[in-house]
Amino acid sequence: MNIVENSIFLSNLMKSANTFELKYDLSCELYRMSTYSTFPAGVPVSERSLARAGFYYTGVNDKVKCFCCGLMLDNWKRGDSPTEKHKKLYPSCRFVQSLNSVNNLEATSQPTFPSSVTNSTHSLLPGTENSGYFRGSYSNSPSNPVNSRANQDFSALMRSSYHCAMNNENARLLTFQTWPLTFLSPTDLAKAGFYYIGPGDRVACFACGGKLSNWEPKDNAMSEHLRHFPKCPFIENQLQDTSRYTVSNLSMQTHAARFKTFFNWPSSVLVNPEQLASAGFYYVGNSDDVKCFCCDGGLRCWESGDDPWVQHAKWFPRCEYLIRIKGQEFIRQVQASYPHLLEQLLSTSDSPGDENAESSIIHFEPGEDHSEDAIMMNTPVINAAVEMGFSRSLVKQTVQRKILATGENYRLVNDLVLDLLNAEDEIREEERERATEEKESNDLLLIRKNRMALFQHLTCVIPILDSLLTAGIINEQEHDVIKQKTQTSLQARELIDTILVKGNIAATVFRNSLQEAEAVLYEHLFVQQDIKYIPTEDVSDLPVEEQLRRLQEERTCKVCMDKEVSIVFIPCGHLVVCKDCAPSLRKCPICRSTIKGTVRTFLS
C-alpha cells in the first residue's frame, strides 16, 4: 500500500526531507482508514468517522478498537457518533483528550497556509485535521518554500499531549547521538518510550510527556517509567498486550486495577501498596497476602524494608512481567544475592534436621531520628490516642506505618483509633497462634522432628491407620487414600504428614498404636529418642528436574485429603496442600514455619 503515490503535495514534502519517513501504525488516521477495506457495507456509521475517532477495524463483524485505550465497540446504530461514544465510554483515553487541543491548534495554525495550499491539502488529505500522520524528522532546509510552511504547520499540529514524531522506536533511538551515559543503553531507553532532550541525561516520554533525569547505574528504563508515570498510555499498552506474555489473571493486568484491591490493606503492613501494584501484585483480601497477576506467585508476611520488586525477582525469576519490566540483569543480580535459594527450596522439604527451626529472614528496620519522632508524635490527634490508654509504642508504630504508606500523619482521631484497634486484634491473633504452638504435645514435637526417619523405619502402617479411623481422627476417605498407596514407604509418608496436620490427639493415638504394632521403633522414638535418619543417596547431585520430580511425588493434599497438591510453601519448600486449602494456612502444617509466599505448581 502506498498512500502518497497520487499526492503531489505529500510527494514533494517527502522529497524535501532526507530523513523523513512515513510510518504505518495505528496512531495514524490514514493507516486506521486502511484497516476498513473489509468493513461491512451495511453499517450505518462511516469508516472515516470511526477512524477519526481513533478506531481501527478488528475484522470481526462491525467491531472496532481504539488504538490508544483499547476500547472496543460494535453493534453500531444509525445516528451514532463514534467520537461522542468514545468520549462517553472512555473519557480518560489520551487520544480522546487530545482531540479538543488538536482542534484548537488547527484553528490557530490554519491562517499560516496560503489559500491554494489549504485547498490542496483538504482535497488530497481529507483527514489532516487530526495529528499523527507523519513520523520521523523533517529537513531544516527544504528546497520548496511551500513545503517549509507546511512543515511549520504540521509541527504545530503535533504539539498535543504526546510527541507524535517520536512514536516510532527507531526515531527515538536517533535522538541519543550525544547520550552521555555508558551504563544505561539508548536502546533500552528508546524501547521504554523515551527520547533524548538534554541537558545532561534528561529524557522524555513521547506518549505521556513525562521527563526523567539523574539516572543511576542500577536503574531500569522501563521500570522507572512505570514507577514515575504508571498511567502513561504507552506503558499501559505495553502491559496490557497479553500476546507478549502469559497472564494468570487478566482482570488484574493494569496498575489501576491492582491498586484498587488495596483499599483495605492492613495499616500495620509496612509496604506501600503503590509499590506492590507496580511490581505486579494485587491484594487477595486476606491478611497481607498478595499475588502476581502474571505468574500467579504469592507472597505474604511483608516486613519493613521489603522491596516488592526484589522479592518478586527472588522467588519468581521466570515471571514474564518481571522480565519485561525489570530486565534479566536485575533478576540476575537479585538471584546472585541468594545463590543457594533453589537448592534450599528443594532440599528443605526432605531435610532430616530439626524442622521446627525457622529460616533466617533479612529484617531491615528504618532508622529512627529522635527529632522527627518528637514532631511526629506531638500532635493533638496522637496525644488524644495516648490519653485514651493505647500503648505509646503501639501508637508510634501505627503512625510510622501510616506515614510510610500514605506520606502523611493522621488527621482524625477516629482513623487512628480504628487502626490501633485493628493492630491490637492482629497482636492478639499472633499471640493465640504462639499459644497454640506452645501447647503442642511432646509426642507431636517428636514426630515432627523425626518425620524423615519415620518415613524410613515405619512399616506397620495399616494398624495405625485403622486406629486413627476408629478414634475418629480421620474419615474413611482419608483412610482409603493412604491405604491405596502401592508402597509401604509412600503409606508411611502420607500417614506421618496426616498426623502432623491433625495435631495432638492424632499424635497420642499414633503413640499408643505404635507401641503395640512396632515396639522397637516405639522405644527408639519415644523412650530413647535416638531414632536416626539414614540418607539413602545424595540427591543434591541429581538434575534439578529429578529433584523436582521427587519433590512432587506425593500428590494428595494433606489437609483435605482429596485434591492434588499444587502449592509449594516459601521458604520451607513443602508441597503438601492444594490451591483451595493453602489460603487458610499461615504456617506450614508439616514444619510449622511461617509461610512467606507460595508457588503454584502444575503436575503432569
From Swiss-Prot:
<dbReference type="GO" id="GO:0033209">
    <property type="term" value="P:tumor necrosis factor-mediated signaling pathway"/>
</dbReference>
<dbReference type="GO" id="GO:0051726">
    <property type="term" value="P:regulation of cell cycle"/>
</dbReference>
<keyword id="KW-0963">Cytoplasm</keyword>
<dbReference type="GO" id="GO:0042981">
    <property type="term" value="P:regulation of apoptotic process"/>
</dbReference>
<comment type="subunit">
    <text>Interacts with PRSS25; interaction inhibits apoptotic suppressor activity. The BIR motifs region interacts with TNF receptor associated factors 1 and 2 (TRAF1 and TRAF2) to form a heteromeric complex, which is then recruited to the tumor necrosis factor receptor 2 (TNFR2). Interaction with TRAF2 is required for ubiquitination of IKBKE, degradation of NFKBIA and activation of NF-kappa-B. Interacts with RIP1, RIP2, RIP3, RIP4 and USP19.</text>
</comment>
<dbReference type="InterPro" id="IPR048875">
    <property type="entry name" value="BIRC2-3-like_UBA"/>
</dbReference>
<dbReference type="Pfam" id="PF13920">
    <property type="entry name" value="zf-C3HC4_3"/>
</dbReference>
<dbReference type="GO" id="GO:0034121">
    <property type="term" value="P:regulation of toll-like receptor signaling pathway"/>
</dbReference>
<dbReference type="InterPro" id="IPR011029">
    <property type="entry name" value="DEATH-like_dom_sf"/>
</dbReference>
<dbReference type="GO" id="GO:0060544">
    <property type="term" value="P:regulation of necroptotic process"/>
</dbReference>
<feature type="binding site">
    <location>
        <position position="319"/>
    </location>
    <ligand>
        <name>Zn(2+)</name>
    </ligand>
</feature>
<keyword id="KW-0833">Ubl conjugation pathway</keyword>
<keyword id="KW-0677">Repeat</keyword>
<dbReference type="GO" id="GO:0016740">
    <property type="term" value="F:transferase activity"/>
</dbReference>
<feature type="binding site">
    <location>
        <position position="292"/>
    </location>
    <ligand>
        <name>Zn(2+)</name>
    </ligand>
</feature>
<dbReference type="GO" id="GO:0050727">
    <property type="term" value="P:regulation of inflammatory response"/>
</dbReference>
<feature type="domain" description="CARD">
    <location>
        <begin position="439"/>
        <end position="529"/>
    </location>
</feature>
<dbReference type="InterPro" id="IPR001370">
    <property type="entry name" value="BIR_rpt"/>
</dbReference>
<feature type="site" description="Breakpoint for translocation to form BIRC3-MALT1">
    <location>
        <begin position="442"/>
        <end position="443"/>
    </location>
</feature>
<dbReference type="GO" id="GO:0060546">
    <property type="term" value="P:negative regulation of necroptotic process"/>
</dbReference>
<feature type="repeat" description="BIR 3">
    <location>
        <begin position="255"/>
        <end position="322"/>
    </location>
</feature>
<dbReference type="GO" id="GO:0006915">
    <property type="term" value="P:apoptotic process"/>
</dbReference>
<dbReference type="GO" id="GO:0070424">
    <property type="term" value="P:regulation of nucleotide-binding domain, leucine rich repeat containing receptor signaling pathway"/>
</dbReference>
<dbReference type="Pfam" id="PF00653">
    <property type="entry name" value="BIR"/>
</dbReference>
<dbReference type="GO" id="GO:0038061">
    <property type="term" value="P:non-canonical NF-kappaB signal transduction"/>
</dbReference>
<feature type="repeat" description="BIR 1">
    <location>
        <begin position="29"/>
        <end position="96"/>
    </location>
</feature>
<dbReference type="GO" id="GO:0061630">
    <property type="term" value="F:ubiquitin protein ligase activity"/>
</dbReference>
<comment type="similarity">
    <text>Belongs to the IAP family.</text>
</comment>
<keyword id="KW-0160">Chromosomal rearrangement</keyword>
<dbReference type="GO" id="GO:0005654">
    <property type="term" value="C:nucleoplasm"/>
</dbReference>
<dbReference type="Pfam" id="PF00619">
    <property type="entry name" value="CARD"/>
</dbReference>
<dbReference type="GO" id="GO:0043066">
    <property type="term" value="P:negative regulation of apoptotic process"/>
</dbReference>
<dbReference type="GO" id="GO:0007249">
    <property type="term" value="P:canonical NF-kappaB signal transduction"/>
</dbReference>
<dbReference type="InterPro" id="IPR001841">
    <property type="entry name" value="Znf_RING"/>
</dbReference>
<dbReference type="GO" id="GO:0031398">
    <property type="term" value="P:positive regulation of protein ubiquitination"/>
</dbReference>
<dbReference type="GO" id="GO:0045088">
    <property type="term" value="P:regulation of innate immune response"/>
</dbReference>
<feature type="repeat" description="BIR 2">
    <location>
        <begin position="169"/>
        <end position="235"/>
    </location>
</feature>
<keyword id="KW-0539">Nucleus</keyword>
<dbReference type="GO" id="GO:0007166">
    <property type="term" value="P:cell surface receptor signaling pathway"/>
</dbReference>
<keyword id="KW-0808">Transferase</keyword>
<protein>
    <recommendedName>
        <fullName>Baculoviral IAP repeat-containing protein 3</fullName>
        <ecNumber>2.3.2.27</ecNumber>
    </recommendedName>
</protein>
<dbReference type="GO" id="GO:0008270">
    <property type="term" value="F:zinc ion binding"/>
</dbReference>
